[in-house]
From Swiss-Prot:
Residues 1-10, 20-36 form a propeptide. Keywords: Toxin. This is MSDIN-like toxin proprotein 10. Belongs to the MSDIN fungal toxin family.
Amino acid sequence: MSDINATRLPGAYPPVPMPCVGDADNFTLTRGENLC
């Protein structure tokens, strides 16, 4: 699905407000989200 592409857009897919959109882009990597 194009969900991964949607995450690249700022505040497009991330369910929670994250200052690091880059980390949110890789939602599959929970480690990256934790770093944010």
